[in-house]
Amino acid sequence: MLSRVAKRAFSSTVANPYKVTVLGAGGGIGQPLSLLLKLNHKVTDLRLYDLKGAKGVATDLSHIPTNSVVKGFTPEEPDGLNNALKDTDMVLIPAGVPRKPGMTRDDLFAINASIVRDLAAATAESAPNAAILVISNPVNSTVPIVAQVLKNKGVYNPKKLFGVTTLDSIRAARFISEVENTDPTQERVNVIGGHSGITIIPLISQTNHKLMSDDKRHELIHRIQFGGDEVVKAKNGAGSATLSMAHAGAKFANAVLSGFKGERDVIEPSFVDSPLFKSEGIEFFASPVTLGPDGIEKIHPIGELSSEEEEMLQKCKETLKKNIEKGVNFVASK
């Protein structure tokens, strides 16, 4: 699903050059994500970092005739990570291990938490003003990890920290179009809450399909919430949702850059430091946000919910609060 903003990414003119860094560029998400960013004409300086493979990916992409320069960095060279990050405008973090059959996003926490923490610390040192887009799962916990690291370093800017939840929205659009036999490019489904299982709440009642039968709706909601499992199973242990996630990450990155450029009405969902349920001890929440030159301009209210969605929200908040606390406590304990 390409929004108007996403389509504008492929225009041939560049008004503002942006430096973008991908941390974990050699992985299953990192490689296709880097390709899509190479094709985005808002990006003129693309830096790719990984423990291995980043230089090969960068060389491969450098043959594509777009107006961006691409360079790979590894920890083997002096200041490799620092040079990949220095003065960059945007950092995308898809680094970490992928899900395997039987694993949940939370099962990834033990491995990915330390990876994200260390990359956040490096970003705080070398690119304290950059927008940070967290893709590494579990996003419900890794975003709070990044926030806590930035706070400890004294450079936390809640307007520039994003958990990328776009995949939930594009899945919702695609899946609802299959059920209702509509054009998926014309579907827009607000998905709120978090980015795993029951914390994912697609607001079907706010679409044109509110009269869908209960059975259809329940099946649709479950598929949106657990769509990642569908891919993990289909790949038979060989990976997770890498290609669709790369598309989602590139789509959201383009939206952030469009906001930086001052384009109007750039609205995308994201898991952010949010006031919506702070009074209940929930510091982060996914909802539509308006993006502008300084990052988040406005966090939109979730609107009117059906009774079913209200019930889903209550269950979401219980789980989400624990997920967030898990991330915060991880940083505090180290």
Curated annotation (Swiss-Prot):
Q: Phosphothreonine (modified residue): where?
A: T199
Enzyme Commission no: 1.1.1.37
Once renumbered to this chain, the transit peptide range reads: 1-17
Q: According to its UniProt record, where is this protein mainly located?
A: mitochondrion
Catalytic residues identified in the record: H195
Location within or outside the cell: Mitochondrion matrix
Q: Which GO terms describe its cellular component?
A: cytoplasm; mitochondrial matrix; mitochondrion
Which Pfam families does the record associate with it?
A: Ldh_1_C, Ldh_1_N
The GO biological-process annotations, alphabetized, read as: aerobic respiration; malate metabolic process; tricarboxylic acid cycle
Q: Which reaction does it catalyse?
A: (S)-malate + NAD(+) = oxaloacetate + NADH + H(+)
Q: Which UniProt keywords apply?
A: Mitochondrion, NAD, Oxidoreductase, Phosphoprotein, Transit peptide, Tricarboxylic acid cycle
Modified-residue entries (Phosphoserine), positions: S177
Q: Is Coiled coil included in the keywords of this UniProt record? A: no
- Subunit notes for this chain? Homodimer.
The UniProt similarity line reads: Belongs to the LDH/MDH superfamily. MDH type 1 family.
The name under which this protein is listed is Malate dehydrogenase, mitochondrial
Gene encoding the protein: MDH1
